[in-house]
UniProtKB/Swiss-Prot annotation:
Ranges for region Required for secretion from the host cytoplasm to the host apoplasm: 21-83
Gene Ontology MF: a single term: receptor serine/threonine kinase binding
Chain residue ranges for the region called Disordered: 116-231
Sugar attachment sites: N32
Species whose genome carries this gene: Globodera rostochiensis (Golden nematode worm)
Keyword presence, DNA-binding: no
Subcellular localization(s) per the UniProt record: Secreted; Host cytoplasm; Host extracellular space; Secreted, Extracellular space, Apoplast
Stated role: Mimics host plant CLE extracellular signal peptides that regulate cell fate. May play a role in the differentiation or division of feeding cells (syncytia) induced in plant roots during infection.
Family as reported in the entry's similarity comment: Belongs to the CLV3/ESR signal peptide family.
A- repeats: 127-135, 148-156, 169-177, 190-198, 211-219
Protein name: CLAVATA3/ESR (CLE)-related protein 4B-1
Keywords attached to this entry: Apoplast, Differentiation, Glycoprotein, Host cytoplasm, Repeat, Secreted, Signal
């Protein structure tokens, strides 16, 4: 590089000297003054460039490319592997499934992954429904076939009049009064008292049931007095 710059400076100095020498001669010949200066300067510049290019080419051939070798060395980075290609990437295997697992196991695993990602479940998962789920599905309540143990309260809600007497045969006197307005059935309650007979028969109790009558009762029954046969 130093030799090239020195040669260029030398050539420029020669060109300038020639230019000034031609200017002095041009003053002596005024008819060529308009075109002499610029034309001569242009010719000198082209000659200088041609000489510098020839000198540079000769030095390059003589030094075996030493001119450009220095530039290349100066452009090198600290990393010596800057032009090295990247390492080859690991190629994936073209097998659909691993050799350790059979195709059936691979398909089963694939189905499980698919159901987990999509949120789908098998039919066996949906068959296990609880009573709470049945209530939500059917607004009236669960199916009586599945739940046969019904209580008295549930039967009252199902039948407004009350539970079925076949299921609940032990009825009390109060329940019979509500069912029959006239009162309970005398067949169920045979032990009737005198007060109950008075309510049933306005004239009084039956003398067959109460044969032991007193003298006061006979007076009320017969105004003339008691029967002398009995007394």
């Amino acid at each position: 590089m130093a030799t090239n710059t020195m040669l260029c400076l030398l050539i420029l100095s020669v060109v300038l000297a020639l230019a000034f020498a031609t200017n002095k001669k041009g003053d002596e010949e005024p008819e060529n003054h308009s075109t002499g200066i610029f034309g001569k300067v242009g010719r000198v510049v082209t000659v200088a460039l041609a000489m510098s290019s020839r000198l540079g080419g000769a030095d390059a051939t003589r030094g075996g490319g030493a001119v450009y070798g220095g530039n290349l060395k100066s452009n090198l980075l600290p990393n010596n592997n800057w032009m090295a290609p990247p390492p080859p990437m690991a190629m994936r295997s073209a097998k659909v499934y691993d050799s350790k697992h059979s195709p059936a196991e691979y398909l089963k695993k694939f189905a499980q992954d698919f159901r987990r990602k999509t949120g789908m479940h098998s039919q066996r998962h949906h068959e296990e429904t609880t009573l709470e789920q049945e209530k939500r599905v059917a607004g009236a309540g669960p199916d009586p076939i599945h739940h046969q143990d019904t209580t008295l309260e549930q039967e009252k809600r199902a039948v407004p009049a009350g539970p079925d007497p076949k299921h609940h045969e032990e009825t009390t006197l109060e329940q019979e009064k509500r069912a029959v307005p006239a009162g309970p059935d005398p067949k169920h309650h045979e032990e009737t008292t005198l007060e109950q007979e008075k309510r049933a028969v306005p004239a009084g109790p039956d003398p067959k049931h109460h044969e032991e009558t007193t003298f006061e009762q006979e007076k009320r029954g017969a105004p003339a007095g008691p029967d002398p046969i009995h007394h």
